[in-house]
Amino acid sequence: TNQMRIATNSSKIDISKENKTASLAKIFSTFLSKGDIVFLHGEIGAGKTTFVRYLINYLQLRSKKSLSEVTSPTFNIMNEYQIKNLIINHFDLFRIEKTKDLQNTGLFNDYKSKLTLVEWPEKIISKPKSRYELFFTFNKNTNKRFIKIKKIIFDLEIKENLGENKYVQIKGDASFRTFLRKSKGKKSSIIVYCKKEKKKNLLNYDAINKNLIKNKIIAPKLYYQNYKNNFIEIEDLGKKTIFEIFSKKNNDNNLK
């Protein structure tokens, strides 16, 4: 199977074609929320700002906002974007030379209420422990560009064109879990990912589902689990919520 994994420590993805950069940025954007910090490493021309542009534009599209012209804040140091209640701070630290200059940027001020994207993070001495790290490389001889993702999201398998499966974030429960609908043609499944919860919480979620099925109560079947990286893939029972289903049943009964 000609597949690659997008988010393990050994991931190396060919993004030489811009549509691959766009597809990967779209998928990656579904995992980001307030408080997340993303470091983008790589030389000039490696594709960092292009990736950020698609990332921000996809977040804007998802919120039905007009698209911004996203450029590298080389001289401004930081550009800010607001998408509804999400503030995105895009930093470029290339021109920063002294620690004092870095402190004046307000880099991690109130970061928990924002999404922080940082190009040239090598200038930062005291780095936050929780962060995503993207490493961009560019081979001038072959004109090839690659990206590695260091912080594990999950080892989601994707075809090399990065466009065969579609991923759409859907409403979940009141927990920190993230739910994605993975689809290809008429086939679909649900990815349940726990970014902020412990392994125990995901095991409990799985155990409850198994118990429901055992007692002949409709619940999604488990297709694949990776408890080490905090995600499972389960059956997609449809797009309607339980409230919509019961509402339809009540209406049908009233008609009778």
Where are these regions (language model features)?
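Short phosphate-coordinating micro-motif centered on Lys-Gly-acidic
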Residues: 4-5, 11, 100-102, 108-159
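Post-Walker A helix-loop "phosphate-sensing" segment adjacent to the P-loop in P-loop NTPases
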Residues: 57-69, 83
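Conserved lysine of the Walker
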Residues: 48
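ATP-binding pocket architecture of kinase catalytic cores
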Residues: 183-256
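ATP-binding glycine-rich phosphate-binding loop
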Residues: 162-183
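P-loop (Walker A) phosphate-binding loop of NTP-binding proteins
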Residues: 43
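Hydrophobic anchor at the beta1->P-loop junction of P-loop NTPases
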Residues: 38-40
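N-terminal pre-Walker A segment at the start of P-loop NTPase domains
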Residues: 4-27
